[in-house]
Amino acid sequence: MTTLLPDPDLVKAFRRAVRRHFEGQVALEREAAEARKAAVLPTVLDSIARARDEGLCERAWLFGSYAWGQPGTRSDVDILVDGCRDPFAVASLVGRACGLDVHVVDWTEAPTSLRDRVLGEGVTL
C-alpha cells in the first residue's frame, strides 16, 4: 500500500495563508480595541472630574483592559478610587456616561499588589 504525502510546497503555502489570515484578524482586533479606548477614555475622564467636583472621590486611576490591555466588546471599566465616599455612586456616574459596566475598587479595600500595579501602570484620571 502506498501512502501519498502532501506536496511540501502546497503545505507551506497553506501555512502562510493561515498565518496571514490570523495576523490580519489580530491586527483588526487591536485596531478595534484602540478605537474602544479612544472612545471611552475622554468620557471616563470627564465623569471622574465630575465625581471629584461633587465630592465623591479625591483621586482615581484607570486599570485593567482599558488601561493596559485590549478591551473587548464585553470589557468593563476598572477604576481604583481613593478618598471615595460612595464607590457605587462613582460607578453609576461613570457607567451612565460611557454606557459600560464599571467596577470601582476603593483604595482601602484593594490588595497592596493591585495598588502597586495601578500606581505603576494605571492611568491617572
Spans of model-derived segments:
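Catalytic core of pol beta-like nucleotidyltransferases
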Residues: 1-58, 68-73, 82-125
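Glycine-rich beta-strand-to-loop/alpha-helix junction loops that act as flexible
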Residues: 62-65
